[in-house]
Amino acid sequence: IARRHDARIETQPFAGYGPQKQAAIELAVGEWILLLDADEHLTEGGRATILRELAAPRADGYRLPRQEWLFWRWPHAGTRANRQLRLFRKARGRMNKVPVHAAPEVEGRVLDLAAPFRHYGEPRLADRVDKINRYSSGLVEYKRGKRVRFLALRLLLYPMLAFLKLYVGKRYFLNGWAGFFAAKTQAFYAFLKYAKLLEAGRDPNRSGPGA
């Protein structure tokens, strides 16, 4: 498919989420970068909006709304989408060094743009739990290096706040059980991140990828 559309295909050993994407950015030959993962795609309306904007760009980077697949359904129209910086000038942006959740950073003006893209998340609860278990383990050493303050308080409060942010703040309650599952697993992810960090501080031998 890529070759049919005159796209160049490059491969390299996996070097981590951020470095891998940065390598792809450096290989790109255009002025603008649209950063999408393999399980994401731009909607037709989003594509048209981007083309109109780039005809006379007002910024160096744009945050796009991401529509999340919630186990067995797309979100209700009233659900508030997360906005992520995904469109930017190549000369002004690069990936940060955060493991697992590496994201682009842009020097210059950044605006919101109503150009939605869709993310096909995990289709089953078990897949989601496996993923957040891996990701939370991958963040342990990074967070230990940052010397997170008030760890015990974060462990107690952040899971509840993560649930409320999605279920109430982002209106996931409009999505029935799928929205409830998504909010609860996000709360569990918040718990795992800080629980594993506390565990690693008490038993450094248990902070590896299999934790």
What is each model feature region?
Residues I1-L27:
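Conserved donor nucleotide-binding strand/loop of the catalytic core
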Residues E40:
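Aromatic, loop-rich ligand-recognition surfaces of beta-strand-rich domains
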